[in-house]
A protein has these predicted regions:
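Acidic, Ser/Thr- and proline-rich intrinsically disordered linker/docking segments
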Residues: 1-13, 17-29, 43-48, 70-154
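A short, Trp-centered hydrophobic/proline-enriched beta-strand micro-motif
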Residues: 33-38
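Conserved beta-hairpin
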Residues: 41-72
């Protein structure tokens, strides 16, 4: 988990916000559950109490500060319950949207674009893993024209 967090902190993340979230998440994670990515809201003016989204290999966790930041509300959704994930990019940031199989839609707005893209990519990988049983490898396909040229040479 520490290695993942070091990688996340290199991507314009607020170290204090990440540290606060991870300290509270440690007691919430199930056995064999690993944090894949954490995205923290960054509103245009001042973000005093940002919402955040944590994606793990087992679920999506929404973290919302309550009572002037003195407490935190966690709402989680297992990957089995997720129907799809989406990213909508705007001028001041991106929205990460996911819908459940019971047709509930959740949106976290004002995420930095880079963070929203990484969140979306990780979510798609987890949904693909759940759907197909294995993650699809990144295969560089050779165009048919190159294959035909190789066949003619033989």
């Amino acid at each position: 988990m520490i290695d993942n967090l070091k990688k996340i902190l290199n991507e314009d993340q607020d170290p204090k916000a990440i540290e606060k979230i991870t300290s509270k998440l440690e007691n919430l994670l199930m056995s064999n559950e690993e944090v894949g990515y954490i995205a923290v809201q960054k509103k245009p003016a001042i973000t005093v109490f940002p919402d955040s989204v944590v994606v793990t290999n087992k679920r999506i966790i929404l973290c919302k500060p309550k009572n002037l930041g003195l407490s935190m509300e966690f709402v989680d959704y297992d990957w089995d319950d997720i129907a799809g994930t989406f990213v909508k990019e705007g001028l001041l940031g991106s929205d990460f949207i996911f819908s459940t199989k019971t047709e509930l839609t959740h949106t976290v707005d004002y995420l930095p674009k880079n963070q929203a893209r990484k969140l979306y990519t990780y979510a798609k990988e987890q949904l693909d893993l759940l759907k197909n049983g294995v993650a699809t490898p990144n295969v560089n396909l050779v165009p048919d024209t190159e294959l035909e040229a190789q066949v003619e040479e033989i």
